[in-house]
Amino acid sequence: MASPRTVTIVALSVALGLFFVFMGTIKLTPRLSKDAYSEMKRAYKSYVRALPLLKKMGINSILLRKSIGALEVACGIVMTLVPGRPKDVANFFLLLLVLAVLFFHQLVGDPLKRYAHALVFGILLTCRLLIARKPEDRSSEKKPLPGNAEEQPSLYEKAPQGKVKVS
């Protein structure tokens, strides 16, 4: 049976991956929701207006929206389907992307309800990355003492009068 850690990582990976595939697709095409697509277009226009540096670099709202959407779809697919290290790399890129989106929302002065989802999914991405990068805990296995393990007493052996003997 899989460990709880593995189940948690897989569940978070699939849920986050599907969410980002969905959100990235909304940024790329109006087929899923015309209203959400229109809202994304409007939001990205305000982001570019609020950050003139993007305009100077030749990045317009369409390019920004489509590049972020494509990155979300690609990383979401990796998070959902690809095993191993690429999943952690996709997680890291999505976390950076969420931080950039939070920056954009703050820059234009959006209320919390407009970017609460980004905050929650940023926290979930952070949790998934921390759980995935934490080494497996093997404390349940007994580690032999150096030398001959039978000759060395344990640290807390029972003494004859019920006292704990510490060596």
Curated annotation (Swiss-Prot):
It is a multi-pass membrane protein. Residues 136-167 are annotated as: Disordered. Keywords: Chaperone, Cytoplasmic vesicle, Endoplasmic reticulum, Membrane, Peroxisome, Transmembrane, Transmembrane helix. It is found in: Peroxisome membrane; Cytoplasmic vesicle; Endoplasmic reticulum membrane. Residues 27-61, 110-114 are lumenal. GO terms for cellular component: cytoplasmic vesicle; endoplasmic reticulum; endoplasmic reticulum membrane; peroxisomal membrane. One of its GO terms (biological process) is chaperone-mediated protein complex assembly. Residues 43-54 are annotated as: Interaction with NGFR. The chain crosses the membrane at residues 6-26, 62-82, 89-109, 115-132. One of its GO terms (molecular function) is acetylcholine receptor regulator activity. Residues 1-5, 83-88, 133-167 are cytoplasmic. Its main location: membrane. May interact with NGFR. Interacts with RPN1, RPN2 and CANX. Belongs to the DoxX family. Molecular chaperone which mediates the proper assembly and functional expression of the nicotinic acetylcholine receptors (nAChRs) throughout the brain. Essential for the proper folding, assembly, function and surface trafficking of alpha-7 (CHRNA7), alpha-4-beta-2, alpha-3-beta-2 and alpha-3-beta-4 receptors. Stably associates with ribophorin-1 (RPN1) and ribophorin-2 (RPN2) (components of the oligosaccharyl transferase (OST) complex) and with calnexin (CANX), both of which are critical for NACHO-mediated effects on CHRNA7 assembly and function. This is Novel acetylcholine receptor chaperone. It comes from Homo sapiens.
